[in-house]
């Protein structure tokens, strides 16, 4: 629209291309703008509950379940949702516990969803998060708050362009290169690790980091 008027949504918009079009009122609400210097932890707050979205992706069923709550749901910059005016919330496809290992794992859509990907990523990321030897509170403790694991289908590293504690980079032979304290384009510390061995490799790195 070259000459769209500054009318609010719900009123008439004019342009040099289209005839006058009337847009419905979608019920947008003007809210107070706040600046956050760091990511807010998941959990219960005075005004509602903050839940995480694994890999930043919601399916239709989860969206419908959220809509059925009939609550004000807001999207945050941190792959999470803030549900207002609710005291507790649990959903199998969302993260409600700040200590859940899934909070610290990122993964691209991987194979077959992306033509550039060499490997499947999401199932591996979930397997790492559910590995008993890497859960919080157990020997070999999975990951302190600053630890992040990134599973990348290729060297592009789309899901996490910055450095992570461990970055697993999928190769054409469907094995992985392992980068420690770096991003997907950095020099690996391990090369050509098979899918079957990759969780053991991650566990070994984390155990040495935690002095186990």
Task: Give the residues covered by each predicted segment.
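Gly/Thr-rich phosphate-binding loop signature of adenosyl cofactor/nucleotide-binding cores
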Residues: 13, 17-67, 72-74, 80-82
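Small-residue-enriched alpha-helical segments and adjacent helix-cap loops
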Residues: 50-177, 203
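Residue-identity detector for glutamine
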Residues: 7-11, 33, 38, 116, ...
